[in-house]
Amino acid sequence: MNFPEGFVKKYEEILGDEARAFLASFDDEAVSAFRINPLKERQLSFSDPIPNTPWGYYGKVSGKSPEHVTGLVYSQEPAAQMVAQVAQPSSGMKVLDLAAAPGGKSTQLA
């Protein structure tokens, strides 16, 4: 991926020797994942769980699959799934998610 020169220089300042590997990582294929809805009864078993997430799994899910359409699973990258784990909001707490589109993190936090 080609980045503006200023972007590259900024990350070289921040990351030093690790900057090249960081910038090269943008050429890697994105990791696909999904999370299951713990409020739905599961009759399917899933393999390849994402560490440190209670409902996350690696893999692809079609938006047209019965599991997705019925709300059993939701496509969501691993990093987005970690937000709820880190935030751990308590009941009744108000949360403002400034990156809430299409709403996956918001539904997970609810």
Question: Residue spans of the language-model regions?
Answer:
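Glycine-rich nucleotide cofactor-binding entry segment
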Residues: 1-108
